[in-house]
Amino acid sequence: MQGLHHFVPTDLKAAYINQLLKVGFDTLDFGSFVSPKAIPQMRDTSEVLAKLDLSGTATKLLAIVANERGAQEACQYPEIQYLGYPFSISETFQLRNTNATIAESIERTKAIQDLCTAHGKEL
């Protein structure tokens, strides 16, 4: 969804994810807490989360984060069980995707792991 040029309305995203929640997946990557300048499509992740019906599902939610700021935001939501960090074996892709080298990303994930531990989340 992040590659789409037109903004997908929040209600449509939530309706789609609510349908996926009915399937019974173990884990669902539902959104990202990243800079809206970097990925405008994900600017409404908090609003999408608020519209999800988690009452009849055992599916766990995973949010992608690319830095500590995103991890801090994601950790504020008890509905989110997992945080994901976009790692690549390609230095070029890692830089383009996270604005950090692989070595810097390793350090970032250490800080993100500390946040996860403090908030009962998994990375």
Residue ranges and their predicted role:
Residues A66-P78:
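Catalytic cores of alpha/beta
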Residues D26-L52, Y85-T101:
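Glycine-rich, proline-tolerant flexible connector loops at the mouths of alpha/beta enzymes
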Residues M1-H5, G84-N97, G120-L123:
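N-terminal small/glycine-rich loop or linker at the start of catalytic domains
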Residues G3, D26-F30, T59-V65, Q81-Y85, ...:
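Hydrophobic faces of well-ordered beta-strands that scaffold small-molecule active sites
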